[in-house]
Amino acid sequence: MRKVLILCTGNSCRSQMAEGLLSSFSENTKVYSAGTKPEKVNPFAIKAMAEMGIDISKNTSNHADEYANIDFDYVFTVCDNAKEICPIYPNAKQMIHHSFTDPADAKGTDSEQLAVYVKVRNQLSDYFKDFADNNLS
């Protein structure tokens, strides 16, 4: 079974959504997510994923250091800050960086904020579906 770690700063939005998506795209892959400064999973991220039928409501936010000794096939950073201060994963076979907009920066009404989360979710979905199809099948 392949192991993938997805990192962002707060482990509350992007990495959580990416974990849920990649898990749904590849049954033979164990996907983890973590943050360099973990926060509670964002309710808008939970709602955006629920719209796709993926439940991340029971996910927890974890610190990146918790996974330092796991032999990962892939370690992703999905924000520039996480890339800059990412812990070293000496056992990772491949480190990959792809920055996505932080939906937590969204302003406006709840529906306007949710729309931003849905947009980022769709970008994550396209990216990680392509990755899974080309690397995990």
Predicted regions and their residues:
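Conserved active-site segments centered on acidic
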Residues: 1-66
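Cytosolic catalytic domains that perform sulfur/thiol-centered chemistry
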Residues: 2-4, 67-78, 117
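Conserved small-residue
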Residues: 11, 49, 75-76, 124
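Short glycine-rich anion-binding loops that position phosphate/pyrophosphate groups of nucleotides
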Residues: 12, 80-83, 102
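Short glycine-/acidic-enriched loop or helix-start segments at secondary-structure transitions
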Residues: 16-18, 43, 85-88, 107
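Residues at the C-termini of beta-strands that transition into short coil/loop
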Residues: 35, 79, 99-101
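Mid-chain, well-packed structural core segment of small domains
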Residues: 70-91, 97
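Phosphate-binding/catalytic loops
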Residues: 86-137
